[in-house]
């Protein structure tokens, strides 16, 4: 598989060559005179493409918002799950209404188990998404800033795991 002219220019640029050195090097390789203007044109196109991409901070914010929405959705499901357990327990005691006057709704154990499975799956998805985003951001950060994810980012994983354990259904 041959590497395109554009890819060669970008690779040499990323290796630290300046445009005139790139033109000289590629002139030897492609058996024709490569001008510095050609190299600068390729680099300008690359900069234009890169400027259209979202910033690292925008990506972090989007990931944070998505994880927050998942956490809120999970809390809503957890409230439904707890209400299902409350109704099931009241039903098992033979009650037709709760002490607060609300009617007891019939709930099947399979429905409770399915809801618990869904809540646990959301936990797993949230943790996996956060860890994957930290890996990606850590990799990008390490190539651009020479650092892995910050300690505060790693602490947030521990807090998330603790939150998941605290919110896990108690049976």
From Swiss-Prot:
Residue pairs linked by disulfide bridges in the UniProt entry: none
Pfam families found in the cross-reference section: TerS_C, TerS_N
Keyword terms of this UniProt record: DNA-binding, Viral genome packaging, Viral release from host cell
Ranges in a coiled coil: none
GO MF term set: DNA binding
Protein family: Belongs to the P23virus small terminase family.
Name assigned to this protein: Terminase, small subunit
């Amino acid at each position: 598989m041959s590497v395109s002219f554009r890819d060669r220019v970008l690779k040499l640029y990323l290796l630290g060559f300046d445009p005139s050195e790139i033109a000289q090097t590629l002139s030897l390789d492609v058996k024709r005179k490569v001008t510095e203007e050609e190299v600068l044109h390729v680099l300008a196109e690359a900069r234009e493409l890169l400027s259209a991409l979202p910033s690292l901070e925008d990506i972090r914010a989007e990931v944070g918002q998505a994880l927050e929405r998942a956490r809120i959705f999970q809390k809503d499901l957890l409230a439904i799950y707890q209400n299902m357990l409350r109704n099931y327990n009241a039903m098992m005691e033979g009650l037709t209404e709760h002490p607060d006057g609300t009617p007891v709704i019939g709930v099947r154990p399979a429905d409770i188990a399915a809801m618990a499975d869904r809540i646990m799956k959301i936990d797993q998805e949230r943790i996996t998404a956060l860890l994957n985003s930290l890996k990606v951001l850590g990799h990008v950060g390490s190539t651009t800033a020479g650092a892995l994810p910050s300690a505060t980012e790693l602490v947030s994983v521990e807090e998330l795991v603790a939150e998941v354990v605290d919110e896990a259904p108690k049976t």
